[in-house]
Amino acid sequence: ELLKQSDTLDMRTELGDRAMDTNDLEKERGITILAKNTAVKVGDKQINILDTPGHADFGGEVERIMGMVDGVLLVVDAFEGTMPQTRFVLKKAFEQNLTPIVVVNKVDRPGARPTEVVDEVLDLFIELGADEDQLEFPVIFASAMNGTSSLDADLATQEHTMKPIFDTVFETIPAPEDNSDEPLQFQVSLLDYNDFVGRIGIGRVFRGKIKVGDNVTVMKLDGTTQNFRVTKLFGFIGLDRVEINEAIAGDLIAVSGMEEISVGETVVEPSH
């Protein structure tokens, strides 16, 4: 719904209920297994979104994603309340000192108990050792199915807009530091493969900038280094991966040109 209501997609684009679950097993089981990333445009701003698995069985994916983001939207069912996977993901977010926003979804569901669910979330925050700032988490009440949201638990206040979520993200979650003038640091958190460009490293530019044609160095997990030339860069917008010429600190991108690259490895300038 965030994709639909942002300034990102063509109005004719048809989205299913689980637009970011593209893996066959995900579609079959109705769960997220592999982390996905996208970005939405809201006015002149951009929000990078990473959809992460919630289940502890896919913990490696969750931990890698938590290292790429500045905050989390914790989505909790207004009827079911907190689940085992809620605890798992939240614990990982707190370990990274991330800023939380709670979204109580499905408030239109029969038997929904949004106010009680917020109390459950607060209890869980306390149990997991949230600090004072994290305990002051903002709450949005929503129905993704209906495309509505509100800052009030009263169902009558729901309006057909995701603006409360967008506004809360901008107000609550810090923007990336502007350190594009520093030496490059790009960390690979996810991998992909394309028959045309080979192995692709996906991750976040933490410092500096990277351009197509740059000669860069991979700091390997075994302590060795390997040089390569950046052949292509891709950014993410909506459901598309788009070619770009340059990326700067804060961007989530995909990089090709590396024959061998592994999750957790870092790309830097050769001089550093």
Protein language model regions, located:
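Conserved nucleotide-binding/hydrolysis modules and their immediate coupling elements
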Residues: Q185-H272
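Canonical P-loop GTPase G-domain recognition
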Residues: T99, D108-P174
